[in-house]
Amino acid sequence: DINKPSIIYWSIGNEDPLTSLHMVSVKLVKALDPTRPVLLPWRPEEWLPKEVDILAPHYWNPQEYDRLAGHSGRPVISTEYTHAYGNDAFGGLEARWKALTKHPAGAGAAVWMWADQGVKTPVRKKEKDLSEDEYLRINTAGWDGIVDSYRNFTRDYWETKAVYAPVYPAVDKISFVPGQDSVRIPIQNDFDFTNLSSVKMAWSVREDENVLYSGTDSMYGYPHTVSDFKLPVEKLVTVRPGRTYYVWFIFTDEKGTEITRRAVELCPQTEQLISVPVCRELLVTEADQVTIEAGDVRYVFSPKNGQLVSAELKGKQLIKDLYPAIWRKLNQGETSGFGKENLRKAVDLTHYTSSVTAWKVEKTPTNAVIRTTVDYRVDQENRFTVTYRYSIGVDGRLNVYYQILTKVAVPWLPIVGMSMQSVSGLDQVHWLGLGPYDAYPNKQAAPILGVWGGTAGSPDVTGIKAMRWMERSGSEGTIHVSNSGYMENDAMCPERTYILSGVFGRPEKGRRAEES
């Protein structure tokens, strides 16, 4: 075989009850090949006969892997875990892998599975709307590889590669004082036999989207140890307020093949005072609509629905609306996580009737504040209430605070946040956060910190992205939004961006994030 496969262990049966036939098979295999261990897939019991060399649990949660591997006298290999069902799930891989392999007994695990179990075939008339994909891999039961049937990489492939990387920074962020010579960044070596001296590190220190300086290094580090890399930071004498500083690492092996790439945030230990332009007057006009002007910036709010209906800069409209978002069409992974019973109860929570129950406008010399409460009624079983506080300062910045209280038939929501529609001319989207891949609370090993972007509605931008700030820009101007959460650009409506405080964690073939 051109791939030169190696037999690591012999596997007897699959997810079977333990019978005398299995033990006869185990003893026969060990007699034929006494050099390799034997396991029974799905059997993790510590009372198994001594002829079973390896314990092999399936689809456990991180706490269960931690408990077993922490005291097991036999190696533990999870011969199936983290089912790659669909292209929108695969949550929790990193937590399970680390819980298992942090112990000496945690010998490894195998995701289910490598490749989709079917040829990628066009479907002209779908009986079921399984996804937005025009192709189908046999059916949903065969749509479970980290690569498709043609070996094209999926998002899950990159997550697996990042989680399994044997070399990586042991921290996500580290502090420094501007002007100091260097900082020590711990590098973890999870190789069994390879010293870090054979691994090359290409690094670059960055300020937002800009590379400040870079270098290439190697270091000495024994297997299964942490060694410090001395990163020079003497060039970071001053830091600019409002900017994010971080270092990118790209690790490659002795053949030049990339192992992984990671980012470590560099946090300056100094007070950063952000100066903003201040206009001379804050003008508030109350009529059928409330208009608040601060210099060249103009905001328009509607007392009828409690929402921002327009934002303008120098007479040009940039934002057309801003309203709460707790629902959208569920993707394949989300439907598996919600389950059939909850899907039967689910309704489209975007179709509602709103009524304003409280509205108050306050003005001081330095800011204007609108406080409002709005009830949104879908039907008798589904409604929600949003309390808003819009605050606009003399610098023209709008701060939006909101609290969403729901009473709906389903126990979970796919998204929670605000939906913002910009004008069509703002077709470029950039964000500081994790990219370029989608990121979720329990699935964010592959994306790394940086500034990412592309054309609105394109594959570079669509999907759930972890963000700190995002910008929409174009011929009409620029919108800058700060948010420590997530964003989602709508491929069907590129002008719409969801600014989110929470998203539904990725399930793992029906097992929700909290269950797996």
Predicted regions and their residues:
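Intrinsically disordered, low-complexity Pro/Gly/Ser/Thr-rich segments with frequent PxxP/GP/PP motifs
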Residues: E209-R243
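Hydrophobic beta-strand positions in extracellular immunoglobulin-like domains
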Residues: I187-F191, V205, V233, F251, ...
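Terminal connector regions
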Residues: L236-I274
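Extended substrate-binding grooves/exosites of carbohydrate-active enzymes
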Residues: D1-P186, D190-S197, A202, E207-N210
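Beta-strand/loop-rich accessory regions of lumenal/periplasmic or secreted enzymes
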Residues: V237-G242, Q269-S516
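Short, acidic/polar linear motifs in exposed loop/turn regions
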Residues: D190-N195, K255, V408-A409
